């Protein structure tokens, strides 16, 4: 069981931008922390499959930020690299969202700090990359 001094971030809406072998990109879903896992869910959508993902902290390798310009807005994307039961590596690309920019920045900072701390507490070689 992992114990963190950091406060667990609030569940929030997040956009999925790809990285998994499922159809459909840029879909709105729900991101939350459950005990020692990060959960992401997105419903079925216009030809896209339902996403129900539970990523244990022990399977996470690194998290880094990237920027993209989707639909004319500068978007900060989280890139969470993890491996599944078959030891295949995936990079989940998502962005926590809030309507008010100041709150969105605070929300993104809280989630990034929490995930970086969770990964680094497991003793990974390079838990945080600021590519």
PLM feature spans:
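Anionic N-terminal interaction surfaces
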Residues: 1-36, 103-104, 110-113, 128-131
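Short, exposed beta-strand/loop patches in secreted or surface proteins that constitute
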Residues: 29-33, 53, 82
């Amino acid at each position: 069981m992992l114990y963190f001094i950091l406060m667990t971030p609030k569940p929030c809406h997040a956009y999925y931008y790809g990285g998994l072998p499922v159809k459909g990109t840029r879909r709105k879903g729900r991101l939350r922390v459950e005990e020692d896992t990060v959960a992401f869910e997105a419903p079925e959508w216009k030809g896209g499959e339902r996403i129900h993902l539970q990523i244990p902290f022990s399977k996470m390798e690194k998290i880094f930020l990237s920027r993209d310009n989707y639909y004319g807005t500068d978007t900060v994307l989280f890139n969470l690299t993890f491996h599944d039961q078959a030891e295949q590596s995936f990079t989940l690309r998502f962005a926590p969202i809030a309507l008010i920019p100041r709150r969105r920045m605070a929300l993104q900072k809280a989630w990034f700090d929490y995930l970086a701390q969770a990964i680094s507490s497991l003793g990974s070689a390079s838990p945080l990359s600021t590519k």
